[in-house]
């Protein structure tokens, strides 16, 4: 009599971690596509972020997954992979000192310009779910209540199409909107079932779009202020330096740049920027016009 055959153990998709070689390939794609740096010791992080993608695609191993994302058919999945490897964390009025500077030093001149028919452009670069851009919008509406009826626009961009869609929906749960001061909640947030939605004026100010900061930018006009916070921490030093230079080229003279609490922009003689506050910089060249 033959011995019973043990059942074959089938590992669920994504349960086997990437090999060192596969991790190196994933890191190379992330760096080439988006300038993101993944350290060699981040295998468990990569597995935890990408396992759900392998499960969704029914792929048992990272070799098969890599073959797919490198193929022409895998272009969209390549973008999803990049999105999964970054952390989409944002809060309303995060690092509030930036919004105080924005309110007290940036907006008075911009509001006066808009009132006289001038153009105002702002950018939330790496906007995540939209909280930063809508914090900018609420602060702007406090300074200029009819801003949405003037030539004033906020661009909110992110590499992740899913967070861009959530930002465009402009709907958040009670916990998410809790950092919004009560007076602003009453003015700019409307009940939407169990959630809250930004009012029409705030939504009208913000345009969301997918944008890879590491790729070409389609925008032609200059910005008066750029918020790019806790984004370049994923980049290596050369990619960071290149991005600061590109922001300098995208800002109007005297334009403002706000970065994350752990990020620093070279400032002073020989650089395009001067320090204007905590993690706040201003492009040289006179007052914004």
Residue ranges and their predicted role:
Residues 254-261:
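Conserved beta-strand signature within the Rossmann-like core of class I S-adenosyl-L-methionine
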Residues 225, 266-289:
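Core SAM-dependent methyltransferase catalytic element
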Residues 2-123, 260:
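Conserved AdoMet
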Residues 129-147:
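Conserved SAM-binding loop of SAM-dependent methyltransferases across substrates and taxa
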């Amino acid at each position: 009599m033959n011995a019973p055959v043990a059942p074959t153990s089938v590992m669920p998709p994504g349960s086997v971690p990437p090999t060192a070689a596969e991790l190196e390939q994933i890191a190379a794609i992330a760096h080439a596509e988006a300038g993101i740096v993944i350290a060699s010791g981040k295998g468990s992080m990569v597995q935890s972020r990408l396992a759900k993608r392998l499960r969704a695609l029914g792929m048992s191993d990272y070799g098969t997954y890599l073959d797919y994302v490198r193929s022409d058919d895998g272009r969209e999945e390549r973008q999803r992979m990049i999105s999964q490897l970054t952390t989409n964390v944002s809060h309303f009025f995060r690092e509030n000192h930036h919004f105080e500077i924005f309110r007290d030093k940036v907006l008075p001149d911009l509001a006066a310009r808009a009132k006289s028919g001038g153009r105002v452009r702002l950018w939330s670069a790496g906007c995540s779910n939209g909280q930063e851009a809508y914090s900018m919008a609420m602060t702007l509406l406090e300074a200029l209540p009819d801003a949405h009826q003037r030539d004033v626009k906020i661009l909110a961009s992110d590499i992740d199409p899913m967070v861009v869609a959530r930002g465009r929906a402009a709907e958040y749960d009670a916990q998410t909107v809790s950092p919004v001061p009560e007076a602003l909640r009453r003015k700019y947030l409307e009940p939407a079932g169990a959630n809250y939605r930004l009012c029409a004026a705030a939504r009208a100010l913000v345009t969301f779009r997918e944008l890879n900061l590491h790729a070409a930018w389609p925008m032609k006009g200059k910005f008066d202020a750029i918020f790019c916070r806790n984004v370049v921490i994923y980049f290596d030093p050369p990619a960071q330096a290149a991005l600061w230079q590109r922001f300098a080229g995208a800002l109007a003279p005297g334009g403002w740049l706000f970065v994350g609490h752990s990020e620093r922009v070279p400032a002073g003689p020989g650089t395009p920027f001067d320090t204007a506050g905590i993690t706040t910089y201003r492009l040289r060249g006179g007052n914004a016009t």
